[in-house]
Amino acid sequence: MKIVLVLYDAGKHAADEEKLYGCTENKLGIANWLKDQGHELITTSDKEGETSELDKHIPDADIIITTPFHPAYITKERLDKAKNLKLVVVAGVGSDHIDLDYINQTGKKISVLEVTGSNVVSVAEHVVMTMLVLVRNFVPAHEQIINHDWEVAAIAKDAYDIEGKTIATIGAGRIGYRVLERLLPFNPKELLYYDYQALPKEAEEKVGARRVENIEELVAQADIVTVNAPLHAGTKGLINKELLSKFKKGAWLVNTARGAICVAEDVAAALESGQLRGYGGDVWFPQPAPKDHPWRDMRNKYGAGNAMTPHYSGTTLDAQTRYAEGTKNILESFFTGKFDYRPQDIILLNGEYVTKAYGKHDKK
């Protein structure tokens, strides 16, 4: 079978660390395994435009492997060219860069799987870290030291504690719930969550979280809001000018879910106006982020409030080990014809939705 693997280039960094599996040089650690079984592996980082390496190989690819960190956007146009495509594997978590509805509604017998759970702890830790970076005003403090400066007042005037704050998560699934667990030791005033379904009673009681069923009511109460929801038709552009106007003035917003959940220009304007005190995360749209993306340079009135990074929260070396192994397990199940996938990994099975996290579920 022909397998197309789309990853980022790591250059010298791949030689520095052999466990940097998620790059073109190290190929998820599966290149020799695939070769030994007689499969053809094409590995590339070139994924944009009709002349890209990805587009060159799509027509006869049996399997495409992609990641959320350097996503191969599997669009309607590309799917129409992919006459042999049987399986798409996301090495990581998040299949929003694949046109799942088009696969489902056109009857294409393509399965889409991801390595569920492979990086939930990694992302949850990053969320809490980003909250601390924003609330404690860490970035400009560190920049002072790098620039050989020392002006405590300039930092302290915009630095706060997490203790005593009301913190809300939009989404309380695998990542969102772990964020709530990790926030408990900080002694927040209250933990809130917004989700389409309530947590089990025992799970709510464990973290002391309260469900708020109206998102405008949720953000109006919160000092800190974190987005931990998948990207789909219902969440794309959810954090826009209108919803931001409902936030408590001077709130902090953290988004490690997907960049397109937020309207980039609206977030930047809210930060610059003071409606938001800070915004941080690691997800952008598109990815890699253009050099002129408004989130690169936005600041609050004190020249702070920006805690953006490249998309790496879910691709720590520990996470890469997990999603590389999970990808291999999915492929092995496919090659042997057992198709005994972990149920939580299946997004589409032969074109039919298995998960409730994505899709319209209205095949015509």
UniProtKB/Swiss-Prot annotation:
Domain of life, per lineage: Eukaryota
InterPro entries: D-isomer_2_OHA_DH_cat_dom, D-isomer_DH_CS, D-isomer_DH_CS1, D-isomer_DH_NAD-bd, FDH_NAD-dep, NAD(P)-bd_dom_sf
Temperature dependence: Broad temperature optima between 45 and 55 degrees Celsius. Reaction rate increases steeply up to 55 degrees Celsius. 50% of activity lost after incubation for 20 minutes at 57 degrees Celsius. Thermal stability increases in the presence of glycerol.
Protein name: Formate dehydrogenase
GO molecular function: ATP binding; formate dehydrogenase (NAD+) activity; NAD+ binding; oxidoreductase activity, acting on the CH-OH group of donors, NAD or NADP as acceptor; protein homodimerization activity
Stated consequence of mutating H311Q: 10-fold decrease in substrate affinity for formate and significant reduction in the catalytic activity compared to the wild-type
CDD domains reported in the protein's UniProt record: FDH
Swiss-Prot/TrEMBL induction comment: Expression is strongly induced by methanol, but is completely repressed in the presence of glucose. However, methanol induced expression is equally strong in cells grown on glucose when formate, methylamine or choline is added. No expression is detected in cells grown on glycerol. When formate, methylamine or choline is added to the culture medium of glycerol- or glucose-grown cells, they exhibit an induction of FDH1 expression.
Variation of activity with pH: Optimum pH is 7.5-8.5.
Organism: Candida boidinii
Result of changing Q197L: 4-fold decrease in substrate affinity for formate but no significant change in affinity for NAD compared to the wild-type
Catalytic activity entry: formate + NAD(+) = CO2 + NADH
Variant or mutagenesis effect after changing E202D: In strain: 2.2159 and NCYC 1513
Effect listed in the UniProt record for changing N119H: 80-fold decrease in substrate affinity for formate and a 1250-fold decrease in substrate affinity for NAD. A significant reduction in catalytic activity compared to the wild-type
Entry binding sites for substrate: V93, N119
